[in-house]
Each structure stands twice: as structure tokens, then as C-alpha cells.
């Protein structure tokens, strides 16, 4: 068997969302900070294409590159690669990374509780893993500072007319719209229509509202549309279903950790969620993230929250991605039957 490249991957999913972890075969990219390293990955595209494009990947897949942390307090760093973006942070991917680090023995597991400090491109996060019999059974993430940006703003959306939305940041940037007002029950059989609607809303919100992170001027767009049900209480606990539409055209199978963080920032800003109060985010496949606001803070002089979310992740496979020197598609390919806007 011959190959001019071997990339070692542990496959994982967190509450339904795939987050593969690259554990070997790739050198850390250039950059003085983890953010600079992630920008190099985003510009270069070589690794992104190799692991995310067909025949090795697909639009449903995310990949996470383990790298040495730049912050001396952190035990590991990682760079997130989503189908269209290389974002500051991801909740489901952080759960996959923490689980792979512990379940595979890359970092030592201490039962019943292991604490990790990890560095994402968007900042430090703390992971607290409940562990038993060699398995990280549930991981809680203390996320980066999150904030509401625009509340109850109006936009004009093609085919939908005037629509009231919120925008917020939870480690990534979101426009949040009321799914019920758009006629959605947030069922799995609505997935294709949810994607089409969400992409229209994201496009309109970027054009008409825009977004700029207060301390990271590089992050100047809205990434996702969160189509969310109104919050309601079950057994006294506030929660809501959602479908987060990810470019170029898929739905997050998990409840979306950065999306739940952004939603909690909006709910707190509107006086609907208190510090310490539980919030349950539910996905289109019925999986859950259990969340709360740990404390209030500020970011770049604006009010913010420190959100926490917890969920489960499971390793699904171990792979070695190879590249035969005669393979005519070393960067892979994307076709629009499954990858919107894709081309060979």
C-alpha cells in the first residue's frame, strides 16, 4: 500500500453532530496565536479540502486539528474546520475533542471528574468531564464570553417579507428567528425547507444588519441562522427546540453549543433567563444540551455572559486517510447534489 500522505483521525459525534479529531500526521500551521494559525488553515484550504471534501468527507462532517496550545495554561489547542468556515469556537466540536482526548488516552483521565483547560481559536474554554470505566460520559464546557448584538431588529427576506430577528454571538455569530412564525414545527421532515429558509435569512441579515466582534475585527459576519421555537418551561425548566442552518446548506444535528450560548445571551438581555437558571436546547433529532449562565461579564466594553453547556459524545471509528500519488483528485471534490454550490 502506498501513500504520499497519512492523516490519523478519530471519528466522533456529539449529540448527533459529527466532529472528527485529527490526532496525527499534520504539523501545526504557522502563526503566533491559535487565531493566526486558524486563519492560515482557512486561507490555505489544503487540509480542509483533504479531510472535508469527498471522497473522504462530506458536507455533514466537521474536523478538528489538535495543536499545541499557545496559552501556557491550556493542556491542548485545536482548530475547528466546518464545511464553509474555520470558526472561533464550536460547542459540539469541543465536546468531541474533549471526549477523544480522554477516551483515547491522549490526556490522562481521572475518575469520576476530569478537568481540562483547552484553547480554541476564540479563546480558552474549560471542560469538566464526568468519567466512569474509562469513558467520558458527559462533558460540560464553560464557553467563551457571549453577547446579544441586535434585539428585535427587522429585516426584509426574499420570499418571506418583513421578519423580526435577534443577532448574537456565542463563540460564533447567529441570526435568530422564530420558527413558529415562519410555519415550522422543527421536525426532521422539514430539514430541506429549513435549510433554504435559513440561508435566505442569513444572507439578508448580513446585508442589512451585519456583525462585528468587539475584540476580534476579523470576525465580521453572521455565520448561521438559528430557527428557534419560543422558549417554554417543562417541569419548571426553560428550554426550546432549534434548527441551526450551517453554510453551505445543512442543519446541525446537535442543539448547537454556540447557538445555545447565543440564545441564552439574548434571553438574558430580554430578562427571560437568570444567572444560574437552567436552559435546555433541543435539536431536530431530539438530542439535548443542558445549559446555564455561569456569570455576567463584559467583552470589549459591552455586557456579556459566561455560558456553560453540557452534552455527550461518542467515538465512532479510527481512520487513516491516505493519498495515493496517482490519485487525480488530491484535493477531493464537491458536487451540488449534496454540497450546495459545490463543483469538481
Curated annotation (Swiss-Prot):
Alphabetical UniProt keywords: Isomerase, Lyase
Residues noted as binding substrate in the record, renumbered to the chain: 91-92, 252, 257-258
Entries under Pfam families matching the protein: Pro_racemase
SUPFAM superfamilies associated with the record: Diaminopimelate epimerase-like
Transmembrane regions: none
InterPro entries cross-referenced by the UniProt entry: Pro_racemase_fam (IPR008794)
Record: active site: 90
EC nos: 5.1.1.-, 4.2.1.77
GO function terms (MF aspect): 4-hydroxyproline epimerase activity; trans-L-3-hydroxyproline dehydratase activity
Top-rank taxon: Bacteria
Reactions the enzyme catalyzes: trans-3-hydroxy-L-proline = 1-pyrroline-2-carboxylate + H2O; trans-3-hydroxy-L-proline = cis-3-hydroxy-D-proline
Record's note on what induces expression: Is up-regulated when the bacterium is grown on trans-4-hydroxy-L-proline (t4LHyp) or trans-3-hydroxy-L-proline (t3LHyp) as sole carbon source.
Family statement drawn from the similarity comment of this UniProt entry: Belongs to the proline racemase family.
Summary of the function given for this chain in its UniProt record: Bifunctional enzyme catalyzing both the dehydration of trans-3-hydroxy-L-proline (t3LHyp) to Delta(1)-pyrroline-2-carboxylate (Pyr2C) and 2-epimerization of t3LHyp to cis-3-hydroxy-D-proline (c3DHyp). No dehydratase activity with L-proline, trans-4-hydroxy-L-proline (t4LHyp), cis-4-hydroxy-L-proline (c4LHyp), D-proline, cis-4-hydroxy-D-proline (c4DHyp), trans-4-hydroxy-D-proline (t4DHyp) or L-serine as substrates. Displays neither t4LHyp epimerase nor proline racemase activity.
Descriptive protein name: Bifunctional trans-3-hydroxy-L-proline dehydratase/2-epimerase
Amino acid at each position: 500500500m502506498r501513500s504520499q500522505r497519512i492523516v490519523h483521525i478519530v471519528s466522533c459525534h456529539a449529540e448527533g453532530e459529527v466532529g472528527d479529531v485529527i490526532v496525527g500526521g499534520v504539523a501545526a500551521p504557522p502563526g503566533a496565536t491559535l487565531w493566526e494559525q486558524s486563519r492560515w488553515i482557512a486561507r490555505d484550504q489544503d487540509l480542509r479540502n483533504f479531510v472535508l471534501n469527498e471522497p473522504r468527507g462530506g458536507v455533514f462532517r466537521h474536523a478538528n486539528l489538535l495543536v499545541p496550545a499557545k496559552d501556557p495554561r491550556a493542556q491542548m489547542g485545536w482548530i475547528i474546520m466546518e464545511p464553509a468556515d474555520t470558526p472561533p469556537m464550536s460547542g459540539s466540536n469541543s465536546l468531541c475533542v474533549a471526549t477523544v482526548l480522554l477516551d483515547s488516552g491522549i490526556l490522562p483521565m481521572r475518575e469520576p471528574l476530569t478537568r481540562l483547560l483547552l484553547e480554541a481559536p476564540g479563546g480558552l474554554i474549560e471542560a469538566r468531564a464526568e468519567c466512569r470505566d474509562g469513558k467520558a460520559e458527559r462533558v460540560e464546557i464553560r464557553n467563551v464570553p457571549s453577547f446579544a448584538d441586535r434585539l428585535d431588529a427587522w429585516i426584509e427576506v426574499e420570499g418571506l417579507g418583513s421578519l423580526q430577528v435577534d443577532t448574537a454571538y456565542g463563540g460564533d455569530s447567529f441570526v435568530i428567528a422564530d420558527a413558529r412564525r415562519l410555519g415550522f414545527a422543527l421536525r426532521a421532515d422539514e430539514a430541506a425547507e429549513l435549510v433554504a429558509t435559513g440561508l435566505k435569512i442569513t444572507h439578508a441579515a448580513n446585508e442589512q444588519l451585519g456583525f462585528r466582534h468587539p475584540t476580534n475585527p476579523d470576525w465580521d459576519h453572521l455565520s448561521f441562522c438559528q430557527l428557534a421555537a419560543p422558549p417554554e418551561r417543562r417541569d419548571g425548566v426553560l428550554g426550546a427546540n432549534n434548527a441551526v442552518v450551517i453554510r453551505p446548506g445543512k442543519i446541525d444535528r446537535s442543539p448547537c453549543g454556540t447557538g445555545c450560548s447565543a440564545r441564552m445571551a439574548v434571553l438574558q438581555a430580554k430578562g427571560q433567563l437568570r444567572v444560574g437558571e437552567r436552559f435546555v436546547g433541543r435539536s431536530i433529532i431530539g438530542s439535548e444540551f443542558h445549559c446555564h449562565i455561569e456569570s455576567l461579564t463584559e467583552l470589549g466594553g459591552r455586557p456579556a455572559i459566561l455560558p456553560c453547556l453540557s452534552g455527550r459524545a461518542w467515538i465512532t471509528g479510527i481512520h487513516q486517510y491516505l493519498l495515493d500519488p496517482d490519485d487525480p483528485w488530491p484535493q477531493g471534490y464537491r458536487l451540488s447534489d449534496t454540497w450546495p454550490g459545490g463543483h469538481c
